[in-house]
Amino acid sequence: MKLNSQAKFLNGKGVVNMAKIVIKNEILEMMLYIWDSVHQKEKISDSFFLEIADNPNMKYLYDGEEFTTESVRKVLSAISNRELLNKPTKKESRFWSKNMWMLEDLGFTNMMVEPVKQLNLTDLEDKLPKDEYEVVFIPGHMDEYYIDGNKLIINFFSIVIDFFGDGPATIADKPIKEYIEEKLLSM
């Protein structure tokens, strides 16, 4: 086993303690359910929208004024009811349009989701100095990513796919895995 300078030894016995990276895409899975249900013209309860809005990983989107938990409920409810938003803020409007974009072609949406579901970051674990990291995908509105302690929160809508299938999915013109590695190393 090759050790790097960031490896830690436990109990002086030469046991390597590498970082652990946890990928969280629960919110993304919930959004897939919403997009599919709306596409199938099924009704979704506002309580489900509130469950998404109340998820602790969604807090990075909230600013207390332009975008709140109520914004998430309002936007997703409007989408579910096939309605336009009444007097939306800029962030609500962006969140609405990004979600509507997902509904245009579920095949395209699934192409964006596939690299997230297949993401394996175990080969990065020996490169990282902290013990544990979280990589979280959320349906954001404006920002590409957020960093909070050992947590990297990525706006799912920042993923760009190659329609022809020749190239990898990217974020900010970098393959997703490379992008994540760069962000994790900067933490």
Spans of features found by a protein language model:
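N-terminal low-structure segments adjacent to metalloprotease catalytic domains
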Residues: 2-111
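Generic surface-pattern signal
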Residues: 54, 77, 81, 126-130, ...
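General "foldedness" signal
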Residues: 41-44, 48, 147-151, 166-168
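Active-site recognition of the HExxH zinc-binding catalytic motif
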Residues: 165-187
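Intrinsically disordered, low-complexity coil segments
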Residues: 12-15, 164-168
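Charged/polar, solvent-exposed surface patches and flexible loops
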Residues: 50-51, 60, 74, 122-126, ...
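Auxiliary, metal-adjacent structural segments of Zn-dependent hydrolase domains
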Residues: 92-164
